[in-house]
């Protein structure tokens, strides 16, 4: 989900889905390759006891190898692979026929009540206007979102293009973004036969037999047995099923404020925008006021955060009792949440402000806690209990089954999405473009509403006269412009819950409050980013992923199974795939990194090699032959082999069960680390939730000079993990500096012997005697071999600078850049005290030449580090004999042209324009 993986086509006239048919099929990997990569991903987890360079456990590894080998040699593997091959030959994607959108409980087990909703979130940057209100920010973003949706529905949205190879990406995932919802799969008659008067019991969550309302005294017939068998088979296939419901004709949004539910039409029948941003502000202010006057709110949204079985039971009851209301929610384009929470601050008074200047570290820690608290409130809201014991926090104002846009009372905006229905790269584009459109509104305002200042200039508003008939009322004076009456255009959903449903809602709310109390979100920024990775010669994503594994190993002394999502939208009907982060090479690096068995240079080399291995894994997955989807498809076919018409013998079933249900393979379906990269300049924070209660969910955004990370965990040391990550990356940088410093005196760069000789000759003939820093006229020593200055760093040509120029150099500091340029600019002075010195003759030019300013190499300290790695280059005046004077003396009154090389050749050019090689930013 990297932010740099896609670009938007500049062809504004292009149709949104014009490339879909030309996309290639997702390849079907070879069975042997998938099993081999599965084995390699699991091996680093099983090693002998001990902390220092412990070897792999031979007994565990042999068991793992044996079960994989037995499965591969058994006919069951060929039967399952053949079924996938038949789907691959006859479908656009071999995964299409597997109904994975109905049953997604194969890749990860259902965790009972102990994990947060698996919804990633992106926090948007602040609005371009300071001190904007909640209603105004909501109106601007909703108006931008409506324009985005209108462009998509009218086929005006430019298609995505791969930034690396220029190939088109699938736009099909955009169809799952709006007007869709996550929903449990119900069997035939399950909702219709549900008894609303039946009290809620725990058995409702476990009993799959939904014919309990039948008369138990009736003697069952053969037909009853057949029906029950068929229902049982259906329940095996769909009992834990989750599917996606689509409503492509949706025109309205759902608004939640203080637990109250409202709907608002935003598109007309031709997908034109109904309201302006100003009109939306009026509507949202009305909703905020209306919801604030109601003391009792409903925590209905907390039902979407409950475990699968509780969620399914609640949806079934709501669908039976409130079918129309639930349909209005499910079919909404997206959800706007008007969160009433405010940002926490660190200032408790003037005393604290004074303390902050004296104790920066203490305040920094407090700021860090406040930043983490703000991440919590924009994600799952606040949990506040009033004097009556009722939940009045904003955590009840969420709906995790759908795409959500959350805007807090202090105008902080966040996009939260369901990872089952929505793709992360698609959400990132939506988030980025609605933010960009919100900024472009300022350009439209100062250009008389010019539509060219928009990402979608062809998207238009509804005709004013038509809108007047639909929504507006005449102002009080009868002659003024029409105004929107919010009461006429906003529809409020009224609930009248029974005691049974009230009980279930209450239990779901208390469970959610417990989860909020259990989980911690830590946000940290580490000052190494894209430029640092470029200097190392590695990909930024690989640098962060590998360093995180080292940090985890240094903290806990063991390797864990971790997954990273990789986009596969370059293929038909494909979204993403997971790759395993851990490998044998990474395990060896972790063991060596925390030891003293090798020096820093070798650790750096090993780190770079491991980053390259990780990058190759990413490329492999992007090519469509990743093993994660393939292995899950094989596992899914075996689980429902009867449904798919695959007949297996007892021996075949046993061989498959030994692999798919083996505890050694269990970490594959229960990853302890989920680490993902998603974000760009329009976002400030990206967070994901862990897959298991004891795991970490780590989201990060890579910037030029820093990495912003968000760690979500339950009873874990997220802040300490970030401390270890900072330490690891700091060590890597110090190793790089040390390696760079010691390489100054190495002949790692090949220079032509002829060029070397010319440098020596040029230095040899330029050692005239000096007096007070100036060449004495008419006096010149005869050069000889004993007088040749062979110091390659002491001559007037600095070879070290040329060697450095072949390496990627540090980006110059911007702090003193102007000062440096001013120092390099030479000015001629007309006050000459000696014509022999200030105005040399042509003969003198040939004999002695002119002096130039030299850019001397930075000194390397005894510890191998650069003496001043973060400051600008020091400017000194260099003479032919290797002596130097300060930059101030170099600009003395007796100098004529100080930018002429001290050579027998008269060469005049601006030396300040010559610098070291600058690192490019193309990563």
UniProtKB/Swiss-Prot annotation:
EC number: 2.3.1.7
Comp. bias intervals (Polar residues): 1-11, 774-787
Positions of (R)-carnitine binding: 576
Residues with PTM N-acetylserine: 2
Keyword set, alphabetical order: Acetylation, Acyltransferase, Cytoplasm, Fatty acid metabolism, Lipid metabolism, Phosphoprotein, Transferase, Transport
Residues the record lists as Phosphoserine modifications: 783
One Pfam family in the UniProt entry: Carn_acyltransf
InterPro entries the record matches: Carn_acyl_trans, Carn_acyl_trans_N, CAT-like_dom_sf, Cho/carn_acyl_trans, Cho/carn_acyl_trans_2
Reactions mediated catalytically: (R)-carnitine + acetyl-CoA = O-acetyl-(R)-carnitine + CoA
Protein purpose: Carnitine O-acetyltransferase involved in the shutteling of acetyl-CoA in the cell.
UniProt-recorded name of the protein: Carnitine O-acetyltransferase YAT2
């Amino acid at each position: 989900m990297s932010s740099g993986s896609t670009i938007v086509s500049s062809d504004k006239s292009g149709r949104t889905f014009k490339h879909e048919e030309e996309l290639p099929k997702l390849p079907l990997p070879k069975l042997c390759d998938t099993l081999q990569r599965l084995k390699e991903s699991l091996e680093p987890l099983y090693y002998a006891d001990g902390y220092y360079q412990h070897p792999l456990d031979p007994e565990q590894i042999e068991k793992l190898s044996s079960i994989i080998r037995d499965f591969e040699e058994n006919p069951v593997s060929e039967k399952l692979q053949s079924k996938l091959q038949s789907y691959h030959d006859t479908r656009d994607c071999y995964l299409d026929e597997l109904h994975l959108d109905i049953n997604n409980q194969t890749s990860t087990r259902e965790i009972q009540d102990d994990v947060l909703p698996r919804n990633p979130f992106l926090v948007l940057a602040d609005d371009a206007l300071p001190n904007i209100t909640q209603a105004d920010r909501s109106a601007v973003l909703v108006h931008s979102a409506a324009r985005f949706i209108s462009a998509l529905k009218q086929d005006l949205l430019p298609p995505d293009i791969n930034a690396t190879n220029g190939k088109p990406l699938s736009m099909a995932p955009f169809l799952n973004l709006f007007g869709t919802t996550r929903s449990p799969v119900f069997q035939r008659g399950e909702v219709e036969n549900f008894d609303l008067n039946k009290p809620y019991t725990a058995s409702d969550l476990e009993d799959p037999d939904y014919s309990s309302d039948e008369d138990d005294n009736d003697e069952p017939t053969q037909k009853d047995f057949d029906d029950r068998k068929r229902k049982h088979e259906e329940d095996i296939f769909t009992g834990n099923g989750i599917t996606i419901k689509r409503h492509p004709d949706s025109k309205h949004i759902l608004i939640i404020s203080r637990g109250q539910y409202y709907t608002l039409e935003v598109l007309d029948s031709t997908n034109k925008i109904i309201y302006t941003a100003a009109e939306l502000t009026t509507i949202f202010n009305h909703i905020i006021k209306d919801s604030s006057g109601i003391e009792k709110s409903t925590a209905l949204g907390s039902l979407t955060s409950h475990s699968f079985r509780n969620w399914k039971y609640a949806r079934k009851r709501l669908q039976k009792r409130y079918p129309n209301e639930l349909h209005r929610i499910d079919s909404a384009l997206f959800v706007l949440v008007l969160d009433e929470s405010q940002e926490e601050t660190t200032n408790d008074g003037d005393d604290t402000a004074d303390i902050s200047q004296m104790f920066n570290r203490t305040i920094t820690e407090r700021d860090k806690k406040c930043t983490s608290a703000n991440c919590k409130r924009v994600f799952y809201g606040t949990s506040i209990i009033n004097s009556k014991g009722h939940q009045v926090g904003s955590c009840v104002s969420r709906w995790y089954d759908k795409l959500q846009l959350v805007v807090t009372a202090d105008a902080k905006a966040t996009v939260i999405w369901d990872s089952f229905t929505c793709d992360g790269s698609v959400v990132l584009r939506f988030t980025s473009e609605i933010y960009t459109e919100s900024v472009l509104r300022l350009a439209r305002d100062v250009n008389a509403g010019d539509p060219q200042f928009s990402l979608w200039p062809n998207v238009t508003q509804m005709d004013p006269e038509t809108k007047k008939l639909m929504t507006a009322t005449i102002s009080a004076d009868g002659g003024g412009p029409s105004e929107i009456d919010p009461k006429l255009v906003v529809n409020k959903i009224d609930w009248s819950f029974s005691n049974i449903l009230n009980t279930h809602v209450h239990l779901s709310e208390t469970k959610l409050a417990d989860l909020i109390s259990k989980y911690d979100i830590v946000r940290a920024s580490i000052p190494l980013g894209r430029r640092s990775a470029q200097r190392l010669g590695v990909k930024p994503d690989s640098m962060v992923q590998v360093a995180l594994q080292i940090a985890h190993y240094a903290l806990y002394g063991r390797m864990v199974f971790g997954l990273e999502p990789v986009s596969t939208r370059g293929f038909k009907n494909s979204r993403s795939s997971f790759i395993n982060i851990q490998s044998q090479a990474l395990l060896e690096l972790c063991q060596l990194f925390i030891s003293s068995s090798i020096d820093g240079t070798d650790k750096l080399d090993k780190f770079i090699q491991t980053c390259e291995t990780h990058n190759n894994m990413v490329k492999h997955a992007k090519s469509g032959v990743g093993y994660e989807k393939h292995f899950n498809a094989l596992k899914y076919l075996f689980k429902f082999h009867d449904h798919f018409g695959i007949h297996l013998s007892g021996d075949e079933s046993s061989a498959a069960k030994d692999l798919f249900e083996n505890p050694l393979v269990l970490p594959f379906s229960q990853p302890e680390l989920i680490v993902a990269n998603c974000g760009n300049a329009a976002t400030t924070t990206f967070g994901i939730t862990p897959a298991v209660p004891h795991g970490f969910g780590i989201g990060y955004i890579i910037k030029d000079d820093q990495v912003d990370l968000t760690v979500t965990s339950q009873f874990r040391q997220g802040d300490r993990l970030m401390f270890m990550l900072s330490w690891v990356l700091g060590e890597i940088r110090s190793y790089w500096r040390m390696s760079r410093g010691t390489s100054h005196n190495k002949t790692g760069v090949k220079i032509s012997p002829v060029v070397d000789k010319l440098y020596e000759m040029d230095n040899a003939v330029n050692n005239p005697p000096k007096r007070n820093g100036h060449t004495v006229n008419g006096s010149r020593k005869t050069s000889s071999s004993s007088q040749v200055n062979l110091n390659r760093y002491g001559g007037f040509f600095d070879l070290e600078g040329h060697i450095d120029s072949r390496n990627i150099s540090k980006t110059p500091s911007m702090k003193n850049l102007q000062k440096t340029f001013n120092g390099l600019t030479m000015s001629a002075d007309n006050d000459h005290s000696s014509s022999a010195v200030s105005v040399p003759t042509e003969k003198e030019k040939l004999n002695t030449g002119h002096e130039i300013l030299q850019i001397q190499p930075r000194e390397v300290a005894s510890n191998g580090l650069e003496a001043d790695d973060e400051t600008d280059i020091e400017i000194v005046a260099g003479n032919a004999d290797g002596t130097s004077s300060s930059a101030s003396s170099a600009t003395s009154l007796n100098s004529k042209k100080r930018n002429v090389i001290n050579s027998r050749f008269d060469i005049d050019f601006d030396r300040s324009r010559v610098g070291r090689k600058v690192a490019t930013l193309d990563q």
